[in-house]
């Protein structure tokens, strides 16, 4: 299968994820010639296995602001690939965070981690929570609520969050 065919398939499967599609398209364009020399790669469905994350975790994060009001944000963790070791990747808190951006970042993190000498897979997570303008207490309450939801999916042998 040609890279353009794979990208079209992914565009149809994930139509609202332009950042993710762009990252995959760029990588596939660079490996297409080498990939086509090895028919065993297509038989093993290597491209789908490389491009599609292992797991997407989406959750609500409810936290209390300084006025006592409950606020709600979305939390995410994209566990992209753990073929060479536990998932590892940063957490990003910013109002622009969405699943497409995190899938793109987790995809890239997989390649970055594979180039180190450490056995680590790739992941990325975060929330549409923006710490800008929040008090230290609000940021702390948000982070506590975020980790209360995320903790069941992480651990030293499974997924290791890092700074962004």
Predicted features and spans:
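N-terminal ligand-binding/catalytic initiation module
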Residues: 1-164
């Amino acid at each position: 299968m040609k890279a353009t065919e794979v990208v079209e398939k992914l565009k149809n499967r994930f139509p609202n994820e332009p950042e993710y599609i762009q990252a995959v398209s760029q990588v596939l364009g660079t490996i297409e010639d080498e990939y086509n020399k090895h028919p065993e790669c297509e038989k093993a469905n290597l491209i789908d296995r490389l491009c599609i994350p292992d797991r997407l975790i989406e959750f609500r994060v409810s936290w209390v602001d300084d006025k006592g009001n409950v606020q709600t944000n979305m939390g995410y963790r994209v566990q992209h690939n753990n073929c060479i070791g536990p998932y590892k990747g940063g957490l990003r808190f910013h109002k622009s965070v969405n699943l497409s951006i995190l899938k793109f970042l987790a995809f890239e993190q997989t390649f970055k981690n594979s180039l180190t000498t450490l056995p680590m897979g790739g992941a990325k997570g975060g929330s549409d929570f923006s710490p800008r303008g929040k008090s230290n207490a609000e940021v702390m309450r948000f982070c506590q609520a975020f980790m209360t939801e995320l903790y069941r999916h992480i651990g030293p042998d499974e997924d290791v969050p890092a700074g962004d």
